[in-house]
């Protein structure tokens, strides 16, 4: 299981559009190697702020990405762009998540 969040889903979606011209995100569940390996992302439709609130409530540690390039990557640039867009219209964050969640739930492989 991986800890990708709703923000990761949106970031990956925009990265795929801008870098490869593909309309694609991440699936909550994906099979690899002919179904021998299954990857799940149980937090894919949960916002980071909700995860952080739960961690605080349960006394769990909250950590940031330790990767040295985490703040200087293309992914970081896309996240900053999204935050800028969302800062002008608070509902746009929810609408973006909801649109991608509906797309993910409707998407069948």
Question: Model segments located where?
Answer:
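C-terminal-of-GTPase-core extension/linker across diverse P-loop GTPases
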Residues: 100-104
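Cys/His-rich short segments
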Residues: 109
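Mid-to-C-terminal catalytic subdomains of enzymes
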Residues: 3-7, 47-93, 97-98
């Amino acid at each position: 299981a991986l800890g990708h969040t709703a923000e990761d889903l949106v970031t990956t979606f925009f990265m795929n559009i801008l870098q490869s011209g593909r309309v694609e995100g991440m699936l909550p569940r994906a099979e690899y190697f002919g179904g021998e390996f299954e990857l799940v992302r149980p937090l894919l439709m949960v916002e980071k702020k909700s995860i952080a609130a739960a961690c605080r409530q349960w006394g769990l540690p909250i950590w940031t990405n330790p990767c040295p390039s985490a703040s200087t990557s293309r992914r970081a640039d896309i996240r900053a762009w999204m935050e800028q867009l969302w800062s002008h219209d608070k509902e746009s964050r929810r609408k973006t998540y909801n649109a991608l969640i509906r797309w993910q739930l409707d998407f069948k492989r």
